[in-house]
From Swiss-Prot:
EC number: 6.3.1.2
Catalytic activity: L-glutamate + NH4(+) + ATP = L-glutamine + ADP + phosphate + H(+)
Record bears the keyword Glycoprotein: no
Native source organism of the sequence: Dictyostelium discoideum (Social amoeba)
Name recorded for this polypeptide: Type-1 glutamine synthetase 1
GO biological process, one term: glutamine biosynthetic process
UniProt entry tagged with the keyword ATP-binding: yes
Domain GS catalytic per the UniProt entry, residue ranges: 158-499
Top EC class, one word: ligase
Amino acid sequence: MIEPQNNKNINNNIYNNNNNNFKMNQDENQLILNSKQLLEKIKISKKKNPQLKFIRVCWIDISNKIRTKAINIDWILNHEPKLIHVSITNVCMSLLCFEDSVTIEALKSENFGEAFLIPITTTKLNILPYCPSHIQIFGEFFYLDNESKKLKPWLLCPRNSLQRAIDRLKNKFGISLKGSFEEEFYLIKKGDNNNSSVASLLNSIEKLDHGTFANYHSLDCYGDILEKITNALEEQGLPIEQLLSESGSGQFEITIDYTDIMEACDRHIIVRQTINSIASYNGYIATFIPKPFDGLVGSGCHAHLSLWDTNDSNLTPDANGECGLSLVNQFFIGGLLKHSKSLTALFNTTPNSYKRLKPFYWSGCNVSWGLDNKESFIRIPSSPFSATDGCSNFEIKTIDHTSNPYLAMAGIIHAGFDGIENSIAPPPPTSLFDQSVLNNQLIPSNFEDAIQSLKENHYLCENIGNDISNAFIHVKLAENKILKELSDDDQILKLLELF
């Protein structure tokens, strides 16, 4: 992951900004104005592309399942509604990722109600390359407050949770988070037997490619499908940085350029959605699950992150700092390590996740940090200019595609906020290959321990939002109860095409 470097020194005033009164400035008048602007964009898009028929308004649920409702564009143009939106039942954030079972404990209210998904006009309105009669936009949830009779941000919306975290960090310290993800996935050729077993899945990919890391031949074997995937991503405005084959047969990684963290999460979703769709239309299954095959390496979505000030200068690098990082970024990392066990519940949400998180798997399960250390929870990537310019970003290695990126990033911001606010210095860094000699703590080795750590972490739950933390905990416990009753292979087959 390459980021522009900026050696601007940290301003000590960053610690003295006591403006921590943050709120989401989305009153009804602004929402209506935004809707009018969206209507004009739709008119322009329809005029340029007469084939357009539907606009998909998308949301990401607690379990990181991509969901959508599609509105007929002609209906919008004929009716010109005051507020373009779709209504969704308020149980939508209590559903399991693999079945529409309601988790009652996840809901604050026992009453049925509606949440209103309103398109976000600051996100891109993309024509879908794999379904060119549809355009897509992300939405955020609001609810009608009975007392004020006004629309308010819904507390069970993951996107709203991240926005609150972004506002908190910016208003208190004048800092914003930028980043991107390493998107790792497997491409599996659909077989004649419908890939009814994990063994048949493995056989189908090994027929094509006996992969190794950065294998030149792998890009040739999968050249046609990879070209369609990368073209589709670029058509949606995603700037691709790198493409490479990973260590597994049929395993690849695509990295997208860094950006503000909310947009990075949106791009992360678009990548998975696009790769899944293009693969399916071309006779492949694309899977992002953490550990589809025991004999092959797992897939993660490592997050590369950096801290920026209000002048859009990178606060992360400092050539004279530990591991080439500024003091503020070291404190941020101190907070992340302090909360690492609780964050694991947000990052790794299925039993399958923990088959990837093992020592010597380079998955970051050691609660430590270090320069170029692939065994540490936080790795500091070096560059040819690290000695003179410092290091421009830090990497969290454990995150996988079962995580809701908005909740994961909200957790990261609040953990880092704690580190900055309380000047939490991280332990000494290490770059030892074998960290077992250091007696480092490990992150939880199973979801039950991770979720218990999150439940007991009142600071994180309160700041992420007690309502959405409760929903996450109960939905994931319900999912994991079902998954734990299945064999490892049946778990894989159940999750294979969900992530």
